[in-house]
């Protein structure tokens, strides 16, 4: 085991799976793995765990997402000053945790850029989101050179890296939908480690992609407002319709280059032109649609601090 800070690893999940085993296998003696579930009826809730692992029952969310509620509970329970937030939907190698934590010790908050991979309708959605996020970073966001957006599925940071406090972070988590966006407001100077990767498999059915896109866009809209981006991409889509051949060539090359730069599958670039045309519709969904499903719950999001859990087990 490497010499590094004792770390609390927070893993929201309702069952004991391969990721739990992977993380437990690489814990140092003073680390802890907190497996965060929702209710006592979850499969993992009454499981006997090995040394260094505790199951924490966060309870049903109220006014926030289930994941945000679980992470808030985990931050309150954590006994160390360095934290890792991660998800259970991708595999990681034996050196993954050490690299993430030591990177955060040397360079400050550290994250990675995930590859959301899937078939079906996701092949159209992925290049649309890539174009949106790339242009947003260039034109709309105010980040320093080299600063990355912290992805809640893989991020390491120290208590002192927070601009406010753990209590303030927990308070915001308990009234929000997106743990990523909440962490982004509390954690500045995050860097991306290009040698860390995560491939997350995404369901490609029309229904699954619809709810995923609404969740992404609605969270962005209630935090920052999507109207300026809707105007921009509507104009771009009209130009692309008027000049289809050059627009298709430019979009395909741009998306292919962006994917190649982060070692992701470049085949998705062939859908760049149709993705460009539907992007205004995707953005408009985030402005207009308030309800969506996520991991067994239906949510209604009216504002950044107005999150209602409508139903579970949908």
Where do the PLM segments sit?
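Catalytic donor/gating beta->alpha subdomain of glycosyltransferases that bind UDP-sugars
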Residues: 116-118, 125-126, 168-227
